[in-house]
């Protein structure tokens, strides 16, 4: 199960980085919440925002 989660995190990071922000963070958050559960939504939002901010700083 952890292997799948690592893969899914990598896919979400790829979507943010390689698609040049064409995929909105709202969509990525929604998909991650579906994958990991609503209890993790605050942490997911925080991580997605950190990744998004890091991309804008490059």
Regions found by a protein language model. Give the residues of each.
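N-terminal acidic leader/helix
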Residues: 1-30, 47, 54-56
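General structural signal for secondary-structure boundaries
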Residues: 5, 39-41, 51
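Short, basic interhelical loop/turn and adjoining N-cap
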Residues: 33-44
